[in-house]
């Protein structure tokens, strides 16, 4: 094995060098130069400085403006809550540990940080699954004219949290474990060792199969069918022009959110699975750290996407920031946009479609 396994850690460097020390007790500057840890600090600070306010503002705007409290927006709020979990309980911890060059909070802190990072990512993924299924049912109409109600939205949210806990909780209960990864200043599930006491292999297969492959397949199936349906409707003029436009644009927004998530998390998933299937392979701490830290950027994608692509939401956010006034004068435009979307709302009971 080209790494060193401890009681509750795995350092990707052989102890033949005599340099390896516990990542809970000593700086890990033998894995990467100190300046690389400072770069991580700057990057995480940027995510905290931008992600925390924009997700809090997303929640504030949604609760303040009654017209935004539509069933499909509940899922978007759920995404914002997941991103806040990651920012508050994941990013802040990673910033401090990277600043010190090792996981200063010990094994318990590592388990907590790994849990919240996994939980936040899973809530985001399963929320996108719910959005994809909603788009498929509303646009493709396999169940007729389906009305997406508040009850359906709350059921979807409950489902996302159930699935997320079923992924993030097992390592806290003895099925696998959370250990420092990469540069040893953030934590994740143990993809690295074959420790029989924790049954790591079965957990990793379960996690990749149930909590990555299946959701991604459902998302791609839903949007594959949806794109075909939108094209058919456009060719046959089955819907009014305004309804077609609104459905296309809300679909485009959700697809961008899915692509943003996949862009952030797929590199991490692929590198982790490669390490898992090639136990003992020689890899640098940076190899795992780069995709691990890049995956955290997903907390910025979703609010930016639906603020940029949803004119009504964007207008509400600007008026909230500017104390009730929109200096860009979009109120009238937003009102007309909202009016034109009532046809979509009558089907999906939602007004998230952008203009």
From Swiss-Prot:
Keyword Glycoprotein in annotation: yes
Name the PROSITE patterns for this protein: G_PROTEIN_RECEP_F1_1, G_PROTEIN_RECEP_F1_2, OPSIN
One biological process term from GO is: phototransduction
Coarse class of the protein's main subcellular location: membrane
- Provide the membrane-side ranges marked Cytoplasmic in the record: 62-73, 134-152, 231-252, 310-355
Concerning PTM, the database record says:
Phosphorylated on some or all of the serine and threonine residues present in the C-terminal region.
Keywords (A to Z) from UniProt = Chromophore, Disulfide bond, G-protein coupled receptor, Glycoprotein, Lipoprotein, Membrane, Palmitate, Phosphoprotein, Photoreceptor protein, Receptor, Retinal protein, Sensory transduction, Transducer, Transmembrane, Transmembrane helix, Vision
**Superkingdom as given in the UniProt entry:** Eukaryota
Region: Disordered; residue ranges are: 332-355
Location within or outside the cell? Membrane
Any one GO molecular-function label of the UniProt entry? G protein-coupled photoreceptor activity
Question: What family is this protein classified in?
Answer: Belongs to the G-protein coupled receptor 1 family. Opsin subfamily.
Kindly provide the name given to this protein in its UniProt entry: Blue-sensitive opsin
UniProt lineage:
Eukaryota, Metazoa, Chordata, Craniata, Vertebrata
């Amino acid at each position: 094995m080209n790494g060193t396994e401890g009681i509750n850690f795995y350092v990707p460097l052989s102890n033949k060098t005599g340099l390896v020390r516990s990542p809970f007790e000593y700086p890990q500057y033998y894995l990467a130069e100190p300046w690389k840890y400072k770069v991580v600090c700057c990057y995480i600070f940027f995510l905290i400085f931008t992600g925390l306010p924009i997700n809090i503002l997303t929640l504030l705007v949604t609760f303040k403006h009654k017209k935004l409290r539509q069933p499909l927006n509940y899922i978007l709020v759920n995404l914002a809550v997941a991103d806040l979990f990651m920012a508050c309980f994941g990013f802040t911890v990673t910033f401090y540990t990277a600043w010190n060059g090792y996981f200063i909070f010990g094994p318990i802190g590592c388990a907590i940080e790994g849990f919240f990072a996994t939980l936040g990512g899973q809530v985001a993924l399963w929320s996108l699954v719910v959005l994809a299924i909603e788009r498929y049912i509303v646009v493709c109409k396999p169940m007729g004219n389906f009305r997406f109600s508040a009850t359906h939205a709350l059921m979807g949210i409950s489902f996302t949290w159930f699935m997320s806990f079923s992924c993030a909780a097992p390592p806290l209960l003895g099925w696998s474990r959370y250990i420092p990864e990469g540069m040893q200043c953030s934590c994740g599930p143990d993809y690295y060792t074959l420790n029989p006491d924790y049954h790591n292999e079965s957990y990793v297969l379960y996690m990749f199969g149930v909590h990555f492959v299946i959701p991604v397949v459902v998302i791609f199936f839903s949007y594959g069918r949806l794109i075909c349906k939108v094209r058919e409707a456009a060719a046959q003029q089955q819907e009014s022009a305004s309804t077609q436009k609104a459905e296309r644009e809300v679909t485009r927004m959700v697809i961008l959110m899915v692509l943003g998530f996949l862009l952030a998390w797929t590199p991490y998933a692929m590198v982790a699975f490669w390490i898992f299937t090639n136990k003992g392979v020689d890899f640098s701490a940076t190899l795992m750290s780069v995709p691990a830290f890049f995956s955290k950027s997903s907390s910025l994608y979703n609010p930016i996407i639906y603020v940029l692509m949803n004119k009504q939401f964007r207008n509400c956010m600007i008026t909230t920031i500017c104390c009730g006034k929109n200096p860009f004068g979009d109120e009238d435009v937003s009102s007309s946009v909202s009016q034109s979307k009532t046809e979509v709302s009558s089907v999906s009971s939602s007004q998230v479609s952008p203009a």
